[in-house]
A protein has these predicted regions:
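Catalytic cores of the polymerase beta-like nucleotidyltransferase superfamily
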Residues: 1-159
Length: 159
C-alpha cells in the first residue's frame, strides 16, 4: 500500500465517520497483518452509511468504479483498493453462483463477517482507531495455527 492509497483510505474513513459510519479493513489484509505477512490486497467494508452516501464519498476522494453491482463493491480508478458495503448471502439454488445477496450497511460486524469462510478471514480492523474486531475467534485460531470455518451450513453451501 503506497502513501497515496493510505491518504485516500484515511480520507474515506474520516468522511464515513463524519457521516455516522465506520470504515474497516476486512479479510486478508487483517489476517496477514496479524500473521506478520506482507499485505497483498486492500479490502475495505464501510458500515453505517447508505450506498448512495458511500458513492458520494467515493466521488469526493477519487473516481469510483462499481464492479460488483449485486454485491455493493467499488474500486477507485488507479488504486488497488476494493470498497464494499456489508452484505449477507443466502444459498438460493444448486449452482455455485446461486445466492441471494442482501446489501445492508446496518447488519453489524458479526453478521457481516458470518458470510466469510474461515475465522481468520472474518477479522475487521477499524481504519481510524486500529481496533481489531474478531467476532469468531480468528486471532486465537491464527495463534494456534487452526483453520476453522465459521458456519457449518454456510460452509457446506459454498465449500
Amino acid at each position: 500500500m503506497n502513501d497515496v492509497d493510505k491518504t485516500l483510505i484515511k480520507k474515506l474513513a474520516e468522511r464515513a465517520s463524519e457521516l455516522g459510519g465506520r470504515a474497516y479493513f476486512v479479510g486478508g489484509i487483517v489476517r496477514d497483518e496479524v500473521m506478520g505477512r506482507p499485505i497483498k490486497d486492500v479490502d475495505i467494508e464501510v458500515h453505517g452509511i447508505s450506498e448512495t452516501i458511500l458513492e458520494t464519498v467515493l466521488k469526493e476522494i477519487g473516481k469510483p468504479i462499481r464492479f460488483g453491482s449485486a454485491f455493493g463493491v467499488y474500486s477507485l480508478a488507479g488504486h488497488n483498493i476494493d470498497i464494499a458495503l456489508p452484505r449477507s448471502e443466502r444459498k438460493s439454488g444448486a449452482g455455485h453462483r446461486d445466492f441471494d445477496i442482501r446489501i445492508d450497511p446496518f447488519i453489524g460486524i458479526k453478521e457481516a463477517a458470518r458470510r466469510r469462510d474461515f475465522t481468520m478471514n472474518a477479522l475487521l480492523k477499524d481504519i481510524l482507531t486500529g481496533e481489531i474486531a474478531d467476532p469468531y475467534g480468528g486471532t486465537e485460531d491464527i495463534k494456534n495455527r487452526i483453520i476453522r470455518h465459521i458456519d457449518d451450513k454456510k460452509f457446506g453451501e459454498d465449500p
